[in-house]
């Protein structure tokens, strides 16, 4: 993404396809993410800067180790400092744990606003790969909850200069 975005999304780490292309969220999860943003008139090309907590993929797609998160944290903090976003979306458990320092399950804290760096607002959201594994759109399902969250994100985004 290009700097000077009011909205950034922080994911976990590059996956296989992201490693190949050198861009975050380019596989099926990224395609779903693009559709989610498009549903409220946002696009990755002009509205959203996307990055990851980790800058390289852990072997065998395992959870990152604490020292791996720590090694990348300075770089992530620098990205946030340079971009000075108004809204930071924490996409998935690893991003939530890294930036909020909580081990609470994302289902309990998704959709809630937290104070972020530089007077920003942070919101944990479901990772699109989780949504791909949970296909139901019934009220209360992960996809239904994500729809509620993206509408709240758009509402707050629209109120910012």
Residue ranges and their predicted role:
Residues 1-161:
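A polyanion-binding, active-site-adjacent surface
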